[in-house]
Curated annotation (Swiss-Prot):
A matching Pfam family: RuvX
Compartments it resides in: Cytoplasm
Gene3D superfamilies (UniProt xref): YqgF/RNase H-like domain
A GO term for molecular function: nuclease activity
Protein name in UniProt: Putative pre-16S rRNA nuclease
UniProt keyword terms in alphabetical order: Cytoplasm, Hydrolase, Nuclease, Ribosome biogenesis
Family to which the UniProt record says this protein belongs: Belongs to the YqgF nuclease family.
Record has Nuclease as a keyword: yes
Predominant subcellular localization, coarse grouping: cytoplasm
Taxonomic lineage: Bacteria, Bacillati, Mycoplasmatota, Mycoplasmoidales, Mycoplasmoidaceae
Biological-process GO terms, alphabetical: rRNA 5'-end processing
EC identifiers of the protein: 3.1.-.-
Keyword Transferase belongs to the record: no
Length: 147
C-alpha cells in the first residue's frame, strides 16, 4: 500500500506519495489554496485517494516544532487542529492510519537538494513544499519500512 505525506502550511500544501512497496517517495503536487482553507486540502486528499484507487493506507503529516528544543510553536497547534479534522474526515475509513512525522529541517533539506540539482530560485519557490513532503515521507519510510 502507498503512503501519502503532507507538508501543510497556511496557504499551500506539498504532497508526496510512495510506491506500492513503500520504498520510494515521489513529489506529487504543490497545492495552493486560500489562507487556512483546510476543507480545500481535504478535498485534494480525496481527489488523490480516487486517483490512486484507494491504495493509500497511511497519511503522514509533517509535524513542526522548534528546531533547537522540539517545543511546540504556532504552526504545531495549526497542524494538530488539522490532524483532528483529518481524523474526523476519515472516521469511517478504519484502514487509513494518520501519523505525525518530525519535519524539522525538511524545507532546508529540500531546498538544498533543489539547489544541488541546479534548479533556479523561481522554480524552487514553486516546488519546495512538494519536495519537503518528499523529505518527510522519506524519513517516515526509512523508520517504518518493515512495519
Amino acid at each position: 500500500m502507498r503512503k501519502l505525506a503532507l507538508d501543510l502550511g497556511t496557504k499551500s500544501c506539498g504532497f508526496a506519495i510512495s510506491d506500492l512497496l513503500g520504498i520510494i517517495a515521489s513529489g506529487l503536487d504543490n497545492f495552493i489554496y486560500e489562507e487556512n482553507d483546510f476543507i480545500a486540502v481535504l478535498a485534494k486528499i480525496d481527489e488523490i485517494m480516487i486517483n490512486y484507487h484507494h491504495e493509500i493506507d497511511t497519511i503522514v503529516l509533517g509535524y513542526p516544532t522548534n528546531v533547537y528544543d522540539g517545543s511546540k510553536n504556532k504552526r504545531t497547534y495549526l497542524i494538530e487542529s488539522f490532524y483532528t479534522l483529518l481524523k474526523q474526515h476519515f472516521l469511517n475509513h478504519e484502514k487509513i492510519k494518520i501519523v505525525y512525522e518530525d519535519e524539522r529541517f525538511s524545507t532546508k533539506i529540500a531546498t538544498q537538494r533543489l539547489k544541488n540539482s541546479c534548479v533556479k530560485a523561481a522554480k524552487i519557490k514553486k516546488v519546495k513544499d512538494k519536495m519537503s513532503a518528499v523529505v518527510i515521507l522519506e524519513s517516515y519510510l526509512s523508520k517504518n519500512h518493515f512495519n
